[in-house]
Amino acid sequence: MGQSVVVLGAQWGDEGKGKIVDLLTEEIGAVVRFQGGHNAGHTLVINGKKTVLHLIPSGILRDDALCLIGNGVVISPAALQKEIAELETSGVEVRSRLKISPAAPLIMPYHIALDQARERAAGGKAIGTTGRGIGPAYEDKVARRGIRIADLHYPKQLEELLRTALDYHNFVLTNYLKTDAVDFQKTFDEALAFGEYVQPMKSDVAGILHDLRKQGKRVLFEGAQGALLDIDHGTYPYVTSSNTTVGGALAGAGVGADSIDYVLGIAKAYATRVGGGPFPTELDDEIGQGIRDRGAEYGASTGRPRRCGWMDIVALKRAVAINGISGLCITKLDVLDGMEKLKVCIAYEYNGKRTEYAPLDAQGWEECTPVYLEFPGWTENTHGITNWDDLPPAARAYLRSLEELAGCPISIVSTGPDRDHTMVLQDPFA
């Protein structure tokens, strides 16, 4: 039987999953995206060249990797076509290697209009979405009025589905959100054109995955966002609209629990968050700004500055538990170079008591005060180090402490953005 590894974020997203997926895709059978949409921004740096992927799996830069988009992903036709065109212009063959589930829902123009209008109306209480229609597309999926890849090849059915959806959404847009309606004919024509474009890539992704496992091939499941943004397990309502945890890999790709052999959780050596929502260890000071500047903490999809803070072990332990994480990958260790001291949150003060468990609601998280353990920093440069013994003693001690506090071994350490700036302590596929 083949080996399957799930790579997912163990914080609030932006942990560096794309680089690690690319690193692990050597001699891979396939890489599959299973949730989210083009709100993801996976940045790869190979030989100094930077590539940002939003929808297409990060394995696309490996010539022999099959890339799959599962039924759990919501697809923007315009974003997908743009990303394919950019990659192929740079010499990367995409369409012959990309397979898309016909059950994947589409992000339609009215989803984008709804997303942006709602955020404007919410004002200071906005969730902080990317405004790209992700949430409304998932809403339609659950409400059974979504339009899927498969529907594009049945014009009469598509017309009926689209008219029904627009009757509903245009009423909300014009009467409640006080914005413009979305035009039926333009939307219909664009959908038909995309149907022709995507037809050669439409495939039974679940079937492909089952066959690859029987053939003994390696498969990597690439998560987007992070576990603490999960619609069920995150800081609701400040969450994304899909299951970013390991269960999302099963449902969003169409495989059983026995198809997963290893879960790799990606976490920065500190913590970041984009948009609204609780963040107990946030540093709204010059230390936080310094981390932001050194770590280039600006969104790959939106360019928004990320909120920065100390490592939160309480939150990380929750991610480890709900995902059954087998091993951790700690990224951006080099960003902490030169800091005199480091802090790690090991517990919260909540309702007058100390707890090592995170609350289950956003308001509870907001009321938590972090309890810190302090560690000495290091003055040496760790950028690009690929050997554990070459790390400064204080950096090694910091990592070993994270490992012990989280109750999970560290399998990989990343010391820079390039594919080669990595040390693999234990290969997840070994």
Swiss-Prot record:
What's in the GO CC field? cytoplasm
**From the record, what ranges are coiled-coil?**
none
Q: Name one GO biological process term.
A: 'de novo' AMP biosynthetic process
What is the catalytic activity of this protein?
IMP + L-aspartate + GTP = N(6)-(1,2-dicarboxyethyl)-AMP + GDP + phosphate + 2 H(+)
Checking Pfam families in the record gives: Adenylsucc_synt
Q: Where is the active site?
A: D14, H42
Residues binding substrate are: A300, S301, T302, G303, R304, P305, R306
Q: How is the cofactor bound?
A: Binds 1 Mg(2+) ion per subunit.
The Swiss-Prot or TrEMBL record annotates one GO molecular function as: GTP binding
Alphabetical list of InterPro entries matching this protein? Adenylosuccin_syn_GTP-bd, Adenylosuccin_syn_Lys_AS, Adenylosuccinate_synth_dom1, Adenylosuccinate_synth_dom2, Adenylosuccinate_synth_dom3, Adenylosuccinate_synthetase, P-loop_NTPase
Known EC number = 6.3.4.4
Which keywords belong to this entry? Cytoplasm, GTP-binding, Ligase, Magnesium, Metal-binding, Nucleotide-binding, Purine biosynthesis
- Could you say which enzyme class this protein belongs to? ligase
Q: Which SUPFAM superfamilies match?
A: P-loop containing nucleoside triphosphate hydrolases
Q: Does this UniProt record's set of keywords contain Metal-binding?
A: yes
Q: Where does IMP bind?
A: D14, E15, G16, K17, N39, A40, G41, H42, T130, R144, Q225, T240, R304
Which HAMAP family does the protein's record reference?
Adenylosucc_synth (MF_00011)
Q: Which family does it belong to?
A: Belongs to the adenylosuccinate synthetase family.
The UniProt subunit note reads as follows: Homodimer.
Name the UniProt record assigns to this protein: Adenylosuccinate synthetase
**Which species is the source of this protein?**
Stenotrophomonas maltophilia (strain R551-3)
